[in-house]
Amino acid sequence: MNLLIMGLPGAGKGTQAAKIVEEFGVAHISTGDMFRAAMANQTEMGRLAKSYIDKGELVPDEVTNGIVKERLAEDDIAEKGFLLDGYPRTIEQAHALDATLEELGLRLDGVINIKVDPSCLVERLSGRIINRKTGETFHKVFNPPVDYKEEDYYQREDDKPETVKRRLDVNMAQEEPILEHYRKLDLVTDIEGNQEITDVFADVEKALLELK
């Protein structure tokens, strides 16, 4: 089974990806792991990516696409199938993935899209607070400190609601054309992500069993 998982930051995509890998035994291909492995193994694309990263530059699409292609061409993929997590990030990368899969004789079986209302995501992502003395991390709603005094805690700039909302807006603008592309191919299953983790996975599992 060859899959792609999508969802905005805070939707619980990483948690569900780990559960899919455990339950279905597919190879988990996350962008970060893929880059680290390619650079550690000094593949052609890995060396190229490292040259950009060492200069503090963004890795261009053609290198990212090349690293994905190298990984998808490995033996375990034909045997186990894959779950792509964190790629494609743009519609151009989605088209490149289509071409790569065709070239390697693989096909995408499904796209799992974990949907959570953006306002819920802002609450999830902007609730993080840090104790000034201990550095411990808490969440205002989901994991509040026992003796909360506002002056004892601070919030990172990245976690402030307005920053989180801007980040989500950027992600939504990138994800929409990708989802539209895969909807036209009838590959997308939307999963309600604003429920308990076990309930989300029950819906994911049901969708994937129907694909098999």
From Swiss-Prot:
Known catalytic reactions: AMP + ATP = 2 ADP
Subcellular localization, as worded in the UniProt entry: Cytoplasm
Main location: cytoplasm
EC id: 2.7.4.3
Keywords of the record: ATP-binding, Cytoplasm, Kinase, Nucleotide biosynthesis, Nucleotide-binding, Transferase
Region (LID): 127-159
Residue segments, region NMP: 30-59
Example GO BP: AMP salvage
Binding residue positions for AMP: T31, R36, E57, L58, V59, G86, Y87, P88, R89, Q93, R156, R167
SUPFAM superfamilies assigned: P-loop containing nucleoside triphosphate hydrolases
Pathway: Purine metabolism; AMP biosynthesis via salvage pathway; AMP from ADP: step 1/1
Source domain of life: Bacteria
MF term (GO), any: ATP binding
Binding site for ATP: G10, A11, G12, K13, G14, T15, R128, T137, F138, Q195
One GO cellular component term: cytoplasm
One Pfam family recorded for the sequence: ADK
Subunit structure: Monomer.
UniProt function note: Catalyzes the reversible transfer of the terminal phosphate group between ATP and AMP. Plays an important role in cellular energy homeostasis and in adenine nucleotide metabolism.
PANTHER family: NUCLEOTIDE KINASE
Comment on protein domains: Consists of three domains, a large central CORE domain and two small peripheral domains, NMPbind and LID, which undergo movements during catalysis. The LID domain closes over the site of phosphoryl transfer upon ATP binding. Assembling and dissambling the active center during each catalytic cycle provides an effective means to prevent ATP hydrolysis.
Family label: Belongs to the adenylate kinase family.
Protein name: Adenylate kinase
UniProt gene name: adk
